[in-house]
Amino acid sequence: FPIEEDKIVGGYECPKHXVPW
């Protein structure tokens, strides 16, 4: 699961995992 610190502001996707939110 993506780490909260890795989330783009707005919760769109995680740059490291690429998982959509």
From Swiss-Prot:
Residues 1-7 form a propeptide. The keyword Oxidoreductase does not apply. It comes from the Eukaryota. It is an enzyme of class 3 (hydrolase). One of its GO terms (molecular function) is serine-type endopeptidase activity. Keywords: Hydrolase, Protease, Secreted, Serine protease, Zymogen. Its EC number is 3.4.21.4. It is found in: Secreted, Extracellular space. GO terms for biological process: proteolysis. Belongs to the peptidase S1 family. This is Trypsin. It comes from Protopterus aethiopicus.
